[in-house]
Design a protein with these regions (language model features):
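Short, well-formed alpha-helical segments that are part of the catalytic scaffolds
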Residues: 2-24, 34-38
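A structural signal for short, well-ordered beta-strand segments and their strand-loop junctions
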Residues: 28, 71-75, 111-116, 171-175, ...
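Short, solvent-exposed loop/turn segments at secondary-structure junctions
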Residues: 9-10, 34-35, 78-80, 118-121, ...
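A short acidic (Asp/Glu
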Residues: 14-16, 38-39, 83-86, 123-129, ...
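Structural motif
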Residues: 1-2, 71
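Conserved catalytic core of nucleotide-sugar-dependent glycosyltransferases
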Residues: 82-163
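Active-site-proximal specificity loops/subdomain of glycosyltransferases
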Residues: 29-75, 80-93
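C-terminal catalytic/acceptor-binding lobe
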Residues: 1, 7-11, 152, 158-242
């Protein structure tokens, strides 16, 4: 198992240190224009600038296959900690929590394994769900089982989750383990400018049409997003649901 971190505009990223402390190897995937600016270990040049997050995710998948990395953790560059909900409390833990997840995943048939947002782990009624939710920000992937790619200009992680349910066995999400990051779109770098420019609104609309009738566009004063009924989608395909 190895951790892949795509990074852009965040020269001070420290996410890799969480994994180093847990003894998990890390590689950073960086655009050519910023490659020499980063002082992080194990840098990989992704060959093209400004191609978006789907491009780099697909680049990492291909890199993993070409270099015989069956299990990868694909982790955002602004993850700053991990937590577990135990005995009524959020307990800060190390990235070695992914070693525990891997040991379980290695015995299971699914392609994607993810965790919750720290802010939500206290609400979990069960330890995990299967094919009822998407996973994002930090994901364990069984690359050997994946022969589909990320789509461009969409809610790429949710879209990839639906593809995984459709084309593969699906997704396990551990609800009482969580990651912590800055507020989405508030941390300069990454997709920050696209969030500011409201591109995510267009992506939500596009995805709603693509995956109808299992999607619904919803609007609040602050955002437009897509609500997805993963359970109904999985059920329509006779996939495992738990």
């Amino acid at each position: 198992m190895i951790c892949f971190i795509p990074t852009k505009g965040r020269l001070n990223t420290k996410t890799y240190k969480l994994f180093e402390e847990a003894g998990i190897e890390v590689k950073h995937f960086i655009e050519p224009k910023e490659f020499d600016l980063y002082e992080v270990p194990n840098k990989i040049n992704i060959q093209k600038d400004n191609q978006g997050i789907s491009y780099v995710r697909n680049f990492m998948l291909q890199y993993a296959k070409e270099n015989n990395h069956q299990w990868i953790i694909m982790c955002d560059d602004d993850i700053n900690s991990f937590y577990e909900y135990r005995n009524g409390k959020n307990i800060k833990v190390g990235a070695d929590v992914w070693i525990n997840i891997f040991q379980k995943a290695n015995q299971l048939p699914f392609e994607l394994y993810g965790i919750n947002n720290k802010q939500l782990i206290w609400t979990a009624k069960q330890d995990y769900v299967i094919n009822k939710a998407s996973v994002e920000a930090c994901i364990l992937m069984n690359v050997n089982k994946i022969d589909w790619n990320y789509s461009k200009d969409t809610k790429e992680d949710k879209d990839f989750a639906l593809k995984t349910i459709k084309e593969g066995n699906g997704i396990v999400k551990f609800l009482k383990i969580g990651f912590s990051t800055p507020t989405v779109g508030s941390n300069k770098g990454g997709l920050h400018e696209k969030y500011k420019d409201k591109q995510d609104y267009k992506w939500a609309e596009k995805m709603t049409k693509k995956w109808h009738p299992y999607t619904k566009l919803y609007k609040t004063n602050k955002k437009v997003d897509v609500k997805i009924n993963y359970k109904a989608f999985a059920k329509s395909l006779n996939k495992i649901i738990k």
